[in-house]
Structure formats: C-alpha cells, structure tokens
C-alpha cells in the first residue's frame, strides 16, 4: 500500500537476530561513508513516508553532499542524514540550508521536527518553524514554573530570546 519494494518478516531466531544486527549497524555504516555527518530525527504521518523519502532522494540528487534517510515505518520516525565528504568550507556551508529545507518539508507534510530524540541544542533553532512565538512563550513559562533557576538543561530547548526581558 505504501509502495514498499521489500518486506521481510522472520520467525527463525537466528534470522531475527541477523535482521536486528543489520538494524543496529545501519547508522555506523552510513557514518563511515563520510568525513562529517549530521543526523536529524523527524516524524511524519505514516501515509507521508513515501513522499518524505522521495523528497530526501531529490535533495540528494540536487546537492554535492550525500543525503539519505531510514527510519521506523511503524511510527513514522525518519532519520535524515546529511553527509560531507570533506570539511571544506563550501561543503560545510551547504549542510544548514539543506537541513532547513528538510525541516520545512517535514512540517509541510504534517510532521514534527523530532521523532524520538527531543529538541536539545541541535534543533532549538528550528522551533520557530513548528511553533509560533506565543506558543513558545507559553512553553517557556511552563519551564520557568518548574525550573525558575534554569538548572535543568540550561539553554538546551528554547531560544534565548524567550527568556530575555
């Protein structure tokens, strides 16, 4: 129904373990392909997975960098990887615009900017794409209610402007 090209289900314990071994090593194998990699997890409705994969494929074709994705089809979680073959300034400068294009597309498809790893330092700059300023301000007020001294994960979720006077 979602145009899968291959599906494998196993009941043999040895074959199940082999599939898990492949799954556990995908990230390491992809990381070994490049000198520098940024991996972002996002989530989209399951019906939008094919469109997400097609978009990532198009990004890959349009860039000198390598871009790929894999994920957990059951919950729509997709890991998007942008990889530079060197640390040349022109390659490094291309990473951020590609990631922002991907984040905007994920939101356009009805997805969310984080699938399983949270916002943290890496994605807080994108929060304004998903949430408007009043929503972010409300979230910041909730945080300050429970953490008025900013002791828990300081600076890791919200843009600093939400706490300036």
List where the protein language model places each region:
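C-terminal substrate-recognition/cap domain of FAD-linked oxidoreductases
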Residues: 1-98, 105, 109
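Short proline/glycine- and acidic-rich turn/helix-capping motifs at secondary-structure junctions
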Residues: 8-22, 113-129, 158-162
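Short, intrinsically disordered/low-complexity patches at protein termini
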Residues: 31, 102-104, 116, 138, ...
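A structural signal for short, well-ordered beta-strand segments
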Residues: 40, 78-82, 117, 123, ...
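Alpha-helical scaffold segments in soluble metabolic enzymes
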Residues: 55, 101, 137, 141
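Short amphipathic alpha-helical interaction segments
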Residues: 90-94, 98, 119, 127-130, ...
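Alpha-helix capping/hinge segments and adjacent helical runs
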Residues: 107-119, 144, 148-152
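Activity-critical C-terminal alpha-helical subdomain
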Residues: 124-165
